[in-house]
Amino acid sequence: MPDLTSVVQEIAEEMRERPDRGEVATYIPELARADPKAFGLVVIDADGQVAAAGDSDVPFSIQSISKVFTLTLALGMVGDRLWRRVGREPSGSPFNSIVQLEYERGIPRNPFINAGAIAVTDLILSRHQPREALGEILRFMQFLAQDSSIAIDEAVAASELRTGFRNAALANFMKAHGVIDNPVEYTLGVYFHHCAIAMTCRQLAEAGRFLAHSGRNPSTGHLVVQPERARRINAVMLTCGHYDGSGEFAFRVGLPGKSGVGGGILAVAPGRASIAVWSPGLDASGNSHLGRIALERLTKRLGWSIFGQ
C-alpha cells in the first residue's frame, strides 16, 4: 500500500493548487469570515499513525458534523426509542427544508438534517437544564478527542442565534406536532451552540476513531458504543450524511461521512482509519467542494471505498 503520509501530502498539494474552491457559507455571517484558501487533511489509522497536511491544526466550526456525536450521545441515553422521533431515510431536500415536515407530520427524515438534529438535541435536553446538556455534549467531544481544550466558538453561536429563523420555524413546527418536548428556545440554544463547537482536523479525526473500529478507540481501549450501534451510525452517515448530496458522496468517495457548512467532513474507513478534511468553500448542496474531491482521491489511491477497490 502507498505510504499514507506521502499520499495525504500529495493530495493536499493538489488541492492547494486548484482554482475551483466552492463558495464559503454566508447565511451564518461569522462563517463568511473563513479563509477560502484554507485546506487541512488528517488521517489516523488503526495503529494510531497520524498523517497530516495543510491547515490540519487550525480550528474551524464543525457545524453539522456535531450531529454525529449528538446522535451517539442520545442513543446512549434513550436507545432505539430515538427512532420514534426521527427517521433514517435520505431527505433528497436541502438540509433546512420544512417541506417534508409538513408532509410527514413533524417527523424529520433523518438525524442529520437540521430538523432531525434539533429533535435529537431535544432528547438530550430532556434530561438536563440547557447549560448542563451543552456541557455534556462538549465533554463527550473532549473525551472522544482526548483534548480538553475543545471549546464552543461563542461568536459563531451568537451569529446563528441572530439569524436562525428557519431553524426556529422547523423547531416550532415540530413542537406543534409533539416531537419537541422542551421550550423551543432552550432546544435551539443548545443546538446552535453544539454546532458552533470549533475543532481542528486532528481533533475531529481522533474523535471519530470509534466509528472506524467497531465502537472502540483502538488507542485508549475505550468502548464508546457497541459494534452494532457503530455500524448503524455509519450506515446513516453513508446514506444521509451529506444532505441532498449524499448519493453523490457515496458514489464518488464510497465511505460513511458527515459534512458541515463550516467546510469540514468527517469520514470513516471501517477497520482502517478515521479521516477529517476541511476546506471552507462549499458546493451547491452545502458540502465542502475540495473536501469531497480530496476524499475521492484518497479512497482511490488507497483502495478504501467500502464498495471495493
UniProtKB/Swiss-Prot annotation:
GO BP terms in the entry: glutamate biosynthetic process; glutamine catabolic process
Cytoplasm recorded as keyword: no
Entry keyword set: Hydrolase
Domain of life: Bacteria
Binding site for substrate: S64, N114, E160, N167, Y191, Y243, V261
Catalytic activity: L-glutamine + H2O = L-glutamate + NH4(+)
Single GO MF descriptor: glutaminase activity
Pfam families: Glutaminase (PF04960)
EC assignment: 3.5.1.2
InterPro entries xrefs: Beta-lactam/transpept-like, Glutaminase
Enzyme class: hydrolase
Xref: NCBIfam families: Gln_ase, PRK00971.1-2
Family in the record: Belongs to the glutaminase family.
Assembly mode: Homotetramer.
HAMAP family for the chain: Glutaminase (MF_00313)
Protein name: Glutaminase
Native organism: Methylobacterium nodulans (strain LMG 21967 / CNCM I-2342 / ORS 2060)
